Amino acid sequence: MTVLIHVLGSDIPHHNRTVLRFFNDALAATSEHAREFMVVGKDDGLSDSCPALSVQFFPGKKSLAEAVIAKAKANRQQRFFFHGQFNPTLWLALLSGGIKPSQFFWHIWGADLYELSSGLRYKLFYPLRRLAQKRVGCVFATRGDLSFFAKTHPKVRGELLYFPTRMDPSLNTMANDRQREGKMTILVGNSGDRSNDHIAALCAVHQQFGDTVKVVVPMGYPPNNEAYIEEVRQAGLELFSEENLQILSEKLEFDAYLALLRQCDLGYFIFARQQGIGTLCLLIQAGIPCVLNRENPFWQDMTEQHLPVLFTTDDLNEDIVREAQRQLASVDKNTIAFFSPNYLQGWQRALAIAAGEVA
């Protein structure tokens, strides 16, 4: 049997590193279909830190796509697992037959599914991408994204799968030893990416709570984002006093980020699509409820796991937030499907499907 090849077709260092380390640590030892990778980006020590994997690095999207297409044409039994699919050349290859549907398995990351960019080239490309998506052999995604995808592509097979968020299961009870009282602290957004719509989110928080809460905005990722960070800072200072606005412009190490999250009372995420599952998982693990846009279908995954969900359209106050905290504290977090290690079973099944080992 031909070994499955995994494709990380865009240079997204943080997510790519997370996937590679997860496969190295959790999957490679038990499946030959979890070891071969083609990745856009620099090695930066990844080969050394993932010795169980065979990783081929490419300088850009185009060179990787050309190599994938050549492999697909040379051996029609070769199957590929695309982790997040932001590479236009690969979509066009699927549409034109360069890659066959039986070779193309796609794990939806969120941004690669929704059509939110307003630029002309995106508007011209989206209809072609939609046509190509009809030819995918199988999609893997959250419950909400599967539902969203099925509205336009009902004939494409879909399987539940969660991004392998880095989590320590021993911290599932960490919320129980923190007393929540006094001024609330609200986390706004999951990164410095513009998709968080930080300024609109700050306005929404201010409309709900006024200048009575402390707002923390993590913007250390992506790099070279100083102009936008300053734009958000100035907008924030027009709404909140300096003592109530904390904008983090430096990237935090994982333990420092966890410590920051534990000081929060609420997460506020205004984006109208599924994103930031990693941050949501860590907040939920810490017993901190989240406010979501009703257009973000991840609320379906949360309610399926009996987790409280607040929406940006709700009338919010401290009593409602404290009640959501109480409800969240009563949930057995060891049973949540999108938590580690529970998502591991979904990955084992996804590998078997993509490799053709199970129907």
Swiss-Prot record:
Pathway named in the protein's UniProt entry: Bacterial outer membrane biogenesis; enterobacterial common antigen biosynthesis
Top-level EC class: transferase
GO molecular function, one term: 4-acetamido-4,6-dideoxy-D-galactose transferase activity
Catalytic activity as recorded in UniProt: beta-D-ManNAcA-(1->4)-alpha-D-GlcNAc-di-trans,octa-cis-undecaprenyl diphosphate + dTDP-4-acetamido-4,6-dideoxy-alpha-D-galactose = alpha-D-FucNAc4-(1->4)-beta-D-ManNAcA-(1->4)-D-GlcNAc-undecaprenyl diphosphate + dTDP + H(+)
E.C. designation(s): 2.4.1.325
Compartment annotation: Cell inner membrane
Cellular component aspect of the GO annotation: plasma membrane
Keywords assigned by UniProt, alphabetized: Cell inner membrane, Cell membrane, Glycosyltransferase, Membrane, Transferase
Keyword set includes Transport: no
Annotated function: Catalyzes the synthesis of Und-PP-GlcNAc-ManNAcA-Fuc4NAc (Lipid III), the third lipid-linked intermediate involved in ECA synthesis.
Family (UniProt): Belongs to the glycosyltransferase 56 family.
Protein name per its UniProtKB record: TDP-N-acetylfucosamine:lipid II N-acetylfucosaminyltransferase
